[in-house]
Structures are given as structure tokens and as C-alpha cells.
From Swiss-Prot:
Cellular localisation: Mitochondrion inner membrane
Database matches in CDD domains: ABC_6TM_ABCB8_like (cd18574), ABC_MTABC3_MDL1_MDL2 (cd03249)
Organism ancestry: Eukaryota, Metazoa, Chordata, Craniata, Vertebrata
Effect of deleting the gene: Conditional knockout in heart results in a severe cardiomyopathy and mitochondrial iron accumulation.
Source organism superkingdom: Eukaryota
The keyword Transit peptide is assigned to this record: yes
Gene Ontology CC terms: mitochondrial ATP-gated potassium channel complex; mitochondrial inner membrane; mitochondrion; nucleolus; nucleoplasm
Complex and partners: The mitochondrial potassium channel (mitoK(ATP)) is composed of 4 subunits of CCDC51/MITOK and 4 subunits of ABCB8/MITOSUR. Interacts with PAAT. Interacts with NRP1; NRP1 regulates ABCB8/MITOSUR protein levels in mitochondria.
Source organism (scientific name): Mus musculus
Entry's family note: Belongs to the ABC transporter superfamily. ABCB family. Multidrug resistance exporter (TC 3.A.1.201) subfamily.
Ranges where the record places region Disordered: 695-717
ABC transporter domain location: 454-691
Protein name: Mitochondrial potassium channel ATP-binding subunit
Molecular functions (GO terms): ABC-type transporter activity; ATP binding; ATP hydrolysis activity
Function statement: ATP-binding subunit of the mitochondrial ATP-gated potassium channel (mitoK(ATP)). Together with pore-forming subunit CCDC51/MITOK of the mitoK(ATP) channel, mediates ATP-dependent potassium currents across the mitochondrial inner membrane. An increase in ATP intracellular levels closes the channel, inhibiting K(+) transport, whereas a decrease in ATP levels enhances K(+) uptake in the mitochondrial matrix. Plays a role in mitochondrial iron transport.
Length: 717
């Protein structure tokens, strides 16, 4: 019956676009066969089936009669629920799905909100200076309000002198002119004062915000940096903080002054002519309402524009930071195209934002000019009717112009404030983040009790950026105190992940990692990384400072003699001394002025200067030539003596002397033993040895010289 229902349509034909292969069947277990729950579920299923089938059937005018298969549909719709109700354990429920279901809509990131609490934290230390700046700005604004009144009185004197032709214009206008000059001078001093204070407050706040943001970023989990680009983070430290600082200064310097001038001028206008002021009072709220509506859209555009700028900065930072790789592969054109594409998107967003702000300002100017025209028309009528003096009309016009300029300044400021709030929200977003793995806090094992015994017990782990893909699966490993344990295997087997968990860059999802019986999650992470574990990677990163400071990076309070000792242990003292500046030699950005072997030996010295109990060597010699590998390997052998060492190696020849070799595959231990024991087993380790030996022999054998073609010889002749 069910097959017949699915095979034939209500008009006697197959349902277009449907087949039996597109059906999914699901059997209900006995645990879900209670009458109430099952009956309601079955009724919902059949109803869904009918709706989906009806949606996929071709629309046509109603038929004059039903085909026999139509009665099957009607009967099936009525009978199937009853049959399934009575026999829930024996029947199959058909769940029909369209082959081409609409793709799931991506979840939109929540809109960032400005964190006023953090803003108050940075503003609080500067409240006294801010209060003084506000007082000075208000004073300057009030002075501006008084100027139109004096100008109106001066115009009235001019009109009186012109009308009556008596009296001395100079004697009558001298007092008002002096008052105006004094007001102009006071206005200039007040403006100078509040701008100086605002500059001081803005720069101090920007410095504090950058310090706090940089500190917060440094304390974030490694998983945070796995998901974020360096260029975007640098953009928040520089561009976003600068944008917020500029907006903050403008809000006080222009925004507060303009608002005060608008309020003061409106009071003066109401005293001069209530009728004209009423006209302004009707128009101004309407303009403010329109501006508020436009603001929400401009705010979203501003946020999108800043995010696009951060993406473009990330592309540029990535290309410039890896310029040697770009040059080696001749990919300058590709990187230019990538950056240009991001800039095009950024330019489009910025132009769209600019058009929105321009529209707002243009509409504002039209409205304000119409207000001036209306003021002249109505005010002129009042002057003609002897209801308003000519000087008062002049004062009203100047005051209304002050209102116009202030409102225009606010309209320009509006776009800046929108960008500033968005930039501040982006800055405060990362300040408010709390790392899952703290930098400090926890137990510190006394130095006399540290043995360096490491145990991985049933560890399961997947990277936060790739949840659900387990890199380690029920992984168990023991590193005895003072022994060398090597991890080998094919790429992607989880070797480097083991080192990352030991450094506690991440926490395992299941299981535990212990040091001398103490779970790493109970220990102080800074103490663990700073004193117990030394880490040497395949690509050591040096800072653009001197050799002395790079080695001392492992122990900031180390003396010069300790630096020299660590360099000797790392076989680095000799080549350092050969430089003209010795230990004061600047190595360049990321150590670009040094060879690979020299950088690696400096990294070894940096790790050894803190005398770690546990040493991690993550393919420390795989990128070196034979001679550099020999020198570095000597330093590593010397450094490994008496320490618990975890060696991650690709070249199996470097781990033959290890006390234990662990062969990893797919996040699990598949073989373990010494070099000789694993060779005897003839397993994966033996196969890896055979492959590397074969590759080495093929590389070392020179290709046979191909005889020249006689034709080519003749052409050369």
C-alpha cells in the first residue's frame, strides 16, 4: 500500500522529480512506541507527507472526475494512520524529503554593542581634566550665543544713525565694539584651553586602550589566534583605536559646543521673537527624527567597512610578513590581486557609507537654508508691521545662522560618531574576552620535587577550529624521567599536537596530561612554560633585536655570563663571536640576517638558558643541511643529557639513540620500542625506514648523462 502511494500521483502518474531512492525510512524502536507519543508523531508525519507531496505536484485545473489512483490516495491518507497506530512495532514510517532542500542560512554574527562599562574604566582617571574641558567648551559656546545679540544692537545703532542723521556713530558704537572684541578674545582663549585638554585626554585614553587591548590579546588562548588573522588584530590596535579617539575628541570639541550653541541660541531666539522661534521648534524635531532613522543604516555600513579594512590589512600583513616565500614562488602578482580585491570591496563599502553621509548632510543643508528663507520672509513681515525691530531681526538671523552651523557640524559629526562607536565596540570586544586557559594561577611544584615524568592518559583532542575531527583518539603515552622519547610517523598523525598539549596550549577534551602525577590543568601555566619546559621548533622565530636579547628572552633576569654559557652549550658562541658586534648584533626581523643553522642554535640557547627539566624538540633539524644538522644535533645531544626529552622527528636517523620510539598513525600509538626492536617487528617503522633509505639513495645517485643529439651539435656549429 505504501509503495503504491509513493509510486503513483493523484492524477494517475508518477510525481515529477520524485523517486523511491529519494525516500528515507526510519524504524521506531520499542522504547518510543507508547500510544500517545507515537500516535501524535505519526499524525504529524502523515500531515507533513501530504503537504510536501501537494507542493511537488504540478498545478492544474480541478479534474471533472478522479482517477482510480486518486481514491488510493484518499484511502491511504485515511487508512495509513490507523494501520500505523495499531501496529507501531511492525510498520515502517516513510519520511519524504525533497532532493534539493534549500541550503541552511548562515548564522549572522551578533551585532557588536558598545561597552559603556569599559569606556567608563578608561575615562574615569581623566574626569577632572574632562570636566575642565567641558566647562571651557560650554563657556566658548555661551560666548558664541552672546555675539549675535551684540551684533544686533550694533546694527540697530547703524540703522538709527542712518535714519535720524544725528549723534556720533563712533561714540555710540565704541562700547559695543569693545565688548565684541573682548568676547572674541575670550572665545579664542576658551577654545585653546579645551582643545589642549581634550588632546591630552584623548591621547592618554588611546594609549591606555592600546595597552589594555594588547595585554588582552597576548593572554588569549592559542585557539583564538588559530581563528583570527594577525592583520585584523593589528588593525584593531591601530586603526580602530585611532578612529575611536578622534570621535571622542570631536564629540566634546564640536558636539558639546554645537549642542550648547543650539540650546543657547534657541533661548535667545525665543526672547527675540516667539513666533519665529515656534517655526524653528516645529521643524527641528522633524529633522532630528529623520537623522535618527538614517543613523541605524549608516552604523551598519560603518561596521562592515571597518571589518573589510581589517581583512585588507590582514592580506597585506600576511604577504609582507612572508615576502621571501612570495618572492620565491614569483607570486607578487597574485598577492597584488588579492590585496586589490579586498581594497575594491573596502572602497565599495566606504563609498556606500560616504553616499549615505553625503545624503544626510545634503538634506540637512537644504532644510536649514529653507529655514533661513522662511525666517527672512516672516521676519520681514513682522518688521514691516512694526512688530519687530530691524536690529532684532538681524540678531535673529545671526543666531539662526549659529543654529544652522551648529546643526551642520552635528550632521558632519554624526558620521564620525557612528564610526567611532563601531570602532570602540570592536576594540572593547576583545578586551572583554577571557581566555579558557589562564596565564597564571595554579600549583607550582617545588624545584626539589620536579622529576620530569610525563603521562598522557586516554587523551582525546580536536582543535577548536575543527571541532568533531579528533586529532588524538584515546592516546596514551608515558615519558619517563630523564629519558628520550621520540614520536615518528606520517604527517597528520598528531605528533605536534602532543607537544602542544604538553605545553598546555590547549586542554584535552577527554583524558589527562600529568607532570609528576599532577594534572597540567592544576599547575601554573606561566611557571610550567617559563621554568619547566623548553621548546625548540622547526622554524625558530627570532625578534628584531640583538643576539643577547634574543637569548635572554628565555630568562629575562639572566646575567651576561649565563647567556654566554647557554650559547656555548648550543654551539653558538663561536659564530656569534665572529660577528663584528658579537652579541650586540641585530638579527633583523625574524632573524633574516642569519642562516637556518645559526637561528636554530640561538633558539637552542634561548631554551637552555632557563635550565628546563623537560625539553621538546619539534623537528629541530629537519630544515637544515647536512653540516648544519651535524652541529645542531651535537648541541641537542648535549642539551638532552639528564632531561626528559620529547623528540618529534621526520628524519628517522636522528632518533635511533632514543630510549623509546613511538610510531603514531591517525592519532593513536601503533608501535612502540627501540630502534632495533621496531626493525625486527617489520611494521610501519620498518616501512618508513625503508622509504627514507630508498629516497636517500635515489637522491644521492647522479642521473646518467644523456648523449647529445648530433643534430643539435650541428646546429651549434
Amino acid at each position: 500500500m505504501l509503495v503504491h502511494l509513493f509510486r503513483f500521483g493523484i492524477r494517475g502518474g508518477p510525481v515529477p522529480g520524485w523517486s523511491l531512492q529519494s525516500l528515507r525510512f526510519q524504524t521506531f524502536s520499542a522504547a518510543r512506541s507508547s500510544d500517545d507519543r507515537l500516535s501524535s508523531h505519526l499524525l504529524r508525519t502523515v500531515a507533513q507527507l501530504r503537504v510536501q507531496l501537494r507542493a511537488h505536484l504540478p498545478r492544474a485545473p480541478p479534474a471533472s472526475h478522479w482517477s482510480p489512483s486518486a481514491w488510493c490516495w484518499v484511502g491511504g491518507t485515511l487508512v495509513v494512520p490507523a494501520v500505523l497506530w495499531q501496529h507501531p512495532r511492525l510498520c515502517l514510517i516513510a519520511l519524504c524529503e525533497a532532493k534539493e532542500s534549500p541550503p541552511a542560512q548562515p548564522t549572522r554574527a551578533p551585532e557588536l554593542r558598545f561597552n559603556w562599562k569599559l569606556f567608563w574604566h578608561f575615562l574615569h582617571p581623566h574626569l577632572l581634566a574632562l570636566g575642565a574641558a567641558i566647562v571651557l567648551a560650554l563657556g566658548a559656546a555661551l560666548v558664541n550665543v552672546q555675539i549675535p545679540l551684540l551684533l544686533g544692537q550694533l546694527v540697530e545703532i547703524v540703522a538709527k544713525y542712518t535714519r535720524d542723521h544725528m549723534g556720533s556713530f563712533v561714540s555710540e558704537s565704541r562700547k559695543l565694539s569693545v565688548q565684541l572684541l573682548l568676547l572674541y578674545g575670550v572665545q579664542g582663549l576658551l577654545t585653546f584651553g579645551y582643545l589642549v585638554l581634550l588632546s591630552h585626554i584623548g591621547e592618554r585614553m588611546a594609549m591606555d586602550m592600546r595597552k589594555a587591548l594588547f595585554s588582552s590579546l597576548l593572554r588569549q588562548d592559542i585557539a583564538f589566534f588559530d581563528a583570527k588573522k594577525t592583520g585584523q588584530l593589528v588593525s584593531r590596535l591601530t586603526t580602530d583605536v585611532q578612529e575611536f579617539k578622534s570621535s571622542f575628541k570631536l564629540v566634546i570639541s564640536q558636539g558639546l559646543r554645537s549642542c550648547t550653541q543650539v540650546i543657547g541660541s534657541l533661548v535667545s531666539l525665543s526672547m527675540l521673537s516667539p513666533r519665529l522661534t515656534l517655526m524653528l521648534a516645529v521643524v527641528t524635531p522633524a529633522l532630528m527624527g529623520v537623522g535618527t532613522l538614517m543613523g541605524s543604516g549608516l552604523r551598519k555600513l560603518s561596521r562592515q567597512c571597518q571589518e573589510q579594512i581589517a581583512r585588507a590589512t590582514g592580506v597585506a600583513d600576511e604577504a609582507l610578513g612572508n615576502v621571501r616565500t612570495v618572492r620565491a614562488f614569483a607570486m607578487e602578482k597574485r598577492e597584488e590581486e588579492r590585496y586589490q580585491a579586498e581594497l575594491e570591496s573596502c572602497c565599495c563599502k566606504a563609498e556606500e557609507l560616504g553616499r549615505g553621509i553625503a545624503l544626510f548632510q545634503g538634506l540637512s543643508n537644504i532644510a536649514f537654508n529653507c529655514m533661513v528663507l522662511g525666517t527672512l520672509f516672516i521676519g520681514g513681515s513682522l518688521v514691516a508691521g512694526q512688530q519687530l525691530k530691524g536690529g532684532d531681526l538681524m540678531s535673529f538671523l545671526v543666531a539662526s545662522q549659529t543654529v544652522q552651523r551648529s546643526m551642520a557640524s552635528l550632521s558632519v559629526l554624526f558620521g564620525q560618531v557612528v564610526r567611532g562607536l563601531s570602532a570602540g565596540a570592536r576594540v572593547f570586544e576583545y578586551m572583554a574576552l577571557s581566555p579558557v586557559i589562564p596565564l597564571t594561577g595554579g600549583y607550582c611544584i617545588p624545584n626539589k620535587d620536579i622529576r620530569g615524568s610525563i603521562t598522557f592518559q586516554n587523551v582525546t583532542f580536536s582543535y577548536p577550529c575543527r571541532p568533531g575531527f579528533n586529532v588524538l583518539k584515546d592516546f596514551t603515552l608515558k615519558l619517563p624521567s630523564g629519558k628520550i622519547v621520540a614520536l615518528v610517523g606520517q604527517s597528520g598523525g598528531g605528533k605536534t599536537t602532543v607537544a602542544s598539549l604538553l605545553e598546555r596550549f590547549y586542554d584535552p577534551e577527554a583524558g589527562s596530561v600529568t607532570l609528576d602525577g599532577h594534572d597540567l590543568r592544576t599547575l601554573n601555566p606561566s611557571w610550567l612554560r617559563g621554568q619547566v619546559i623548553g621548546f625548540i621548533s622547526q622554524e625558530p622565530v627570532l625578534f628584531a633585536t640583538t643576539i643577547m636579547e634574543n637569548i635572554r628572552f628565555g630568562k629575562l633576569d639572566a646575567s651576561d655570563e649565563e647567556v654566554y654559557t647557554a650559547a656555548r652549550e648550543a654551539n653558538a658562541h663561536e659564530f656569534i663571536s665572529s660577528f663584528p658586534d658579537g652579541y650586540s648584533t641585530v638579527v633583523g626581523e625574524r632573524g633574516t640576517t642569519l642562516s637556518g643553522g645559526q637561528k636554530q642554535r640561538l633558539a637552542i640557547a634561548r631554551a637552555l638558558i632557563k635550565q628546563p627539566t623537560v625539553l621538546i624538540l619539534d623537528e629541530a633539524t629537519s630544515a637544515l643541511d647536512a653540516e648544519s644538522e651535524r652541529v645542531v644535533q651535537e648541541a641537542l645531544d648535549r642539551a638532552s643529557a639528564g632531561r626528559t626529552v620529547l623528540v618529534i622527528a621526520h628524519r628517522l636517523s636522528t632518533v635511533r639513540a632514543a630510549h623509546s620510539i613511538i610510531v603514531m598513525a591517525n592519532g593513536q600509538v601503533c608501535e612502540a620500542g627501540t630502534h632495533e626492536e621496531l626493525l625486527k617487528k617489520g611494521g610501519l617503522y620498518s616501512e618508513l625506514i625503508r622509504r627514507q633509505t630508498l629516497d636517500a639513495s635515489l637522491t644521492s645517485t647522479p642521473p646518467a648523462e644523456k648523449p647529445e643529439d648530433p643534430k643539435s651539435c650541428q646546429s651549434k656549429a
